[in-house]
Amino acid sequence: MAPKKSVSKAGKELEVKKKGGKKEPVVAVEPPLAKEMKEFYHIQIRDLEDRLARYQRKWDELAVQEKMFRQEFEQLANNKKEIVAFLKRTLNQQVDEITDLNEQLQNLQLAKEMEKDAFEAQLAQVRHEFQETKDQLTTENIILGGKLAALEEFRLQKEEVTDKFTLLEEQVRKQENEFRDYAYNLEKKSVLDKDRLRKEIIQRVNLVANEFHKVTTNRMWETTKRAIKENNGITLQMARVSQQGMKLLQENEQLKGRQNNLCKQLELLENTQKVMARHKRGHQKIILMLTKKCQEQQQDTKEAEELRLLLSQLEQRSLQLQVDNQALKSQRDQLSLQLEQQQVDLQRLQQELANEQKVRASLEAALVQATSFLQNILQMHRDEEDSDVDVTFQPWHKEMLQQLLVMLSSTVATRPQKAACPHQESQSHGPPKESRPSIQLPRTGSLLPQLSDITPYQPGDLGLVPRQVHIPPNPQDLRLLSYITRVGTFRAHSSPEMRAPGSLKRLEKFSLPEVPLRPK
């Protein structure tokens, strides 16, 4: 670009010289200083063209970034709308849940009160019935205790009578056995005695007969006398035996009468035993009835205990429902506090959005003014390509570019401060992460660091490498330049500030307008 413009300028100068040569054939000899200035201006023009192309690229990048920022901002607005709608929907759901829980709690309280009244009435009725049954059973127990005592006495008497009866039976059996043995022995003895007496009589008779036969001849009288005596003795013995038999018969009759008496007593005892067995059956039935009533009473007591346990469980359930009610109330209060906090955050976000919109509008205005300013500079540069180049234009041009960069850098410098203030406020006044929902904001400040990285122009800085520290000029590079260029670069490195000459007052129409850096 620069060589073509220089060639066109040289052609125009030659045409002008030719036209002037027709009038005055004067040969203009260019001094060496003008050549050096021309080279210097050519170098400056190349630098400015490169810088202009670089600024054009940066402007395109900024336009693309501004478009991306606008898309991110629209996405942020949509996300914010969705978040607000979601929060409202969740809030409505929580409010509905709270109302449902309140209704359920009221219904449970009413049901609990009704159940409590019903159970209290049932418990009072059960207590009354239990007291009545208790009194009735105590009286029945007293009566049955008396009956049991009588039955116990009767049982003892019965045992005594049965023992006596068994003893009497044993005695009767023993006496019968003894009587039978005695009668058998007597009969046996009588039979044996009869046999023995008969044998003895026969033997005696035989002996007597023998002796009689013997003594008949000798002692007839003595033998007869002796036989009479023996006969008398035998008759006496026979009388004694008959008397003993009579006594035995009398004793036998007495034993038979005693046996009859014992049989009668046995029949009486059997009758009394049957009567006692009947009474025993009746008492057993009464005891069974009493045991059944006692079991029923125990079952009633168990039911009363179960009712007491059920009542205690209902009381515990009512206490648990009260605790749940308190927890639901506290949860409702927390949700209301979270809702208020979210409303405050929503207002703050809306305010930040308004501030961002204002700052964005100010940035757009600054960019529009900067683009118009650059277009004016380019237009002025194109207009002056056809005319004579003023020596004082180049420093003024540098000063205007530096003023443009200062304006852009000040705009970028004020923007991060405003972007950092709401972030600090949100960190200082924001609720904890647990109570506030996480809202992921888009990267709105992605454009700001890139704008803040743009350093203001300094003379001698081509902008290819960002310089953060002062780099002194290389003497070997300065040898290739002319004296004026070396002095200019040295002054640019020593003092970056430049003053516009007084002849530039005619270009005041290209001065930068005032740009509001902060939103009103």
Swiss-Prot record:
InterPro entries: CFAP157. Transmembrane segments: none annotated. Residues 1-22, 416-453 are annotated as: Disordered. It comes from the Eukaryota. Residues 437-453 have a biased composition (Polar residues). GO terms for molecular function: microtubule binding. It is found in: Cytoplasm, Cytoskeleton, Cilium basal body. GO terms for biological process: sperm axoneme assembly. One of its GO terms (cellular component) is ciliary basal body. Residues 33-189, 236-372 form a coiled coil. Its main location: cytoplasm. Keywords: Cell projection, Cilium, Coiled coil, Cytoplasm, Cytoskeleton, Differentiation, Spermatogenesis. Residues 10-22 have a biased composition (Basic and acidic residues). Belongs to the CFAP157 family. Specifically required during spermatogenesis for flagellum morphogenesis and sperm motility. May be required to suppress the formation of supernumerary axonemes and ensure a correct ultrastructure. Interacts with TUBB and TUBA4A. Interacts with CEP350. This is Cilia- and flagella-associated protein 157. It comes from Homo sapiens (Human). The lineage of its organism: Eukaryota, Metazoa, Chordata, Craniata, Vertebrata.
